[in-house]
Amino acid sequence: MPSITTAKREYEERLVDCLTKYSCVLFVGMDNVRSQQVHDVRRGCRGKAEFIMGKKTLQAKIVEKRAQAKDASPEAKPFNDQCEEYNLLSGNTGLIFTNNAVQEITSVLDGHRVKAPARVGAIPCDVVVPAGSTGMEPTQTSFFQALNIATKIAKGMVEIVTEKKVLSVGDKVDNSTATLLQKLNISPFYYQVNVLSVWDRGVLFTREDLMMTEDMVEKMLMEGLSNVAAMALGAGIPTSSTIGPMLVDAFKNLLAVSVATSYEFEEHNGKELREAAINGLLAGSGSAAAEPAAAAPAAPSAAAKEEPEESDEDDFGMGGLF
């Protein structure tokens, strides 16, 4: 049997070798995972990845020592800094090293997910007890009453009238809920090796990053493109997405000038468009063009009304002087 020092040295050599040989490290949670699941995951990752467990204090020392070495690789120090900043080497976690796509490893982990009954103190997901016959005798209605579940007796069996949510995300399972779910043969939990973070080619992806879907990324890109196009349109910068609206706006302005000045341009049916704009037969551009046309004739008439008033005031003022 090797000594403790020898075992630690061999473990350090293996961990450093994995950190050097593989470009991707998956930090995985091992809470409530059984030894058989770990064995199955190791077997499923064979040829694709290496799965390493161990004391986190020892792992942290090895990673720090590797980063401080004179011949340290460029990614050694950033990896150590990220591990310290996000406290990655802590708790009940394991390390999976791979050069393959992350999706290949997560598919292996998902393939070894195991159903489990509710346990007292566990933090669950949403659990709904469905309506219908339970197969339980009327003497056991107290379990349902404790959880405010409406029941009735039908054909000598307890029947749930309407479905009832008994657990929500963040709740802790109490004795009554755990007992009832076991009697109803409901196993609401799934335990598996769960990916917490991923270090891939010098970039750390947190759990929130990993939860993003392709639809979410596509939505963000479309919103960004829309904002850029709106800024370009507002600033008058022609782009492939703004050149069309800019040409339409320019043509509307030309049509408005045509209506206001009685000038008819021959191109693009200018005469017909001008008449249609005056008669209010154009949608959008017609109303925009008609407004300047209506405002233009009104201006001279207003000026004509103001001129006599000014002349009257001048005459009154001169008469007062003489």
Swiss-Prot record:
Annotated keywords: Phosphoprotein, Ribonucleoprotein, Ribosomal protein
Subunit: P0 forms a pentameric complex by interaction with dimers of P1 and P2.
Annotated protein name in UniProt: Large ribosomal subunit protein uL10
Organism this protein belongs to: Leishmania chagasi
One GO MF term: structural constituent of ribosome
Compositional bias annotation for Low complexity: 292-303
Top-rank taxon: Eukaryota
Biased composition (Acidic residues): 307-316
Primary role: Ribosomal protein P0 is the functional equivalent of E.coli protein L10.
Gene Ontology process terms (BP): cytoplasmic translation; ribosomal large subunit assembly
